[in-house]
Amino acid sequence: MGILSDDVVIISQSEKEGDPSVITINCPDKTGLGCDLCRILLFFGLNIVRGDVSTDGKWCYLVFWVIGKPNTRWNLLKMRLVEASPSFSWAFGISRCYLSDSESQPPKLPDLFLLKLACSDRTGLLYDVTEVLYKLEINIEKVKISTTPDGKVMDLFFVTDTRELLGTVKRRNEVYEYLRDAIGDSMISYDIELVGPEITACSTSSSVAETLFSSDVSGEHSSGLHTSSNVSIAVDNSLSSAHTLIHITCQDHKGLLYDIMRTFKDFNIQISYGRFTIKLGKNCEIDLFIVQSDGRKILDSSKLNALITRLRAELQQPLRVVMMNRGPDTELLVTNPVELSGKGRPQVFHDIALALKKIDTCIFSAEIGRHVTGDREWEVYKVLINEEDSLPIPRSKIEEEVWKTLMGWE
């Protein structure tokens, strides 16, 4: 049983460049739906300039005003938004024993593949590869990149396929053709093989962990880490008898709504009504009427304080960027929190590669892994800069360029 996709998601594309397109989503509700939808919008590179959300706990209505790009794939976007929306049966509380196997079973973990790519090195090579994988909806879970003394690059990408077709010859040939068009004669060899999920396990050294995870973002730029300024969060439990009101003012950044929705999803908080607007100067105002999973407002001060503390940290520092010395070399470190569901932030590695390409900075090696500290899991991106083949750029400039690109402040 389901709803016609044309009724679930309606996209009204803007007629004039620079004007927002309007995405309307009308579907059954579930905790974390807003996070899942905003994650998709972030993956497609859309900038949300306004948003309205309302739900009665069973059915929700969401409207996003977004600024797209000339190459935005609107039909594919609609397909992914429909897939993320709950089925019709969800809204009517149909028992799990009456659901189809596809609806009653927990989601199957996607197959993990190893993409091995050998190329001649050049500036911007990694960005070109990540851009191709992004266009093909192939998700990078982990990467190991190294450069040999004779100028060859071996890229090992551990990837999953959104379309779940990478096990087919046709899909692998498609990936090869796209990479060949982007890389050209620089490509030396190419191969894809199925691997086990345990291969993605990774640990981070204690010195790196201390730098990235122990800083207090409530103060100044501790440990040289960048933060977003002017974050204000107010709580009102008196305005509504049934809801807790969260009022947020802050500076806009790429994925702002995703960071807010992700936090609420991790805390199992439901949004009954919400409004998001961007004022002049890229300042945002957000009003959210929220309830706990039991449908009641949040009266427990300890729960409320924990939520606000986490929310403030996510808005001040959704990602952490720092340059470190690694012997005579320079290492760029970027990290971001992982959802409790295990999903990481979209397009981080793509944006790191883009930022380094813009300032003609070469990459000698790169790794993506995960690190657990306390009750949280983080994605960690480690990039060793090839300073010999790069322009003489101050390390602070590299750090700032990567931060601005990740935050969407180019």
Swiss-Prot record:
Assigned keywords, A-Z: Repeat
Family annotation (PANTHER family): ACT DOMAIN-CONTAINING PROTEIN ACR10 (PTHR31096:SF23), ACT DOMAIN-CONTAINING PROTEIN ACR4-RELATED (PTHR31096)
Entry keyword annotation includes Transferase: no
Role summary: May bind amino acids.
Transmembrane segments: none
Name of the protein in its database record: ACT domain-containing protein ACR10
InterPro entries: ACR1-12, ACR2/9/10_N, ACT-like_dom_sf, ACT_ACR9/10_C, ACT_dom
GN (gene name): ACR10
Provenance organism: Arabidopsis thaliana
Domain called ACT: residue spans: 22-105, 114-197, 245-324
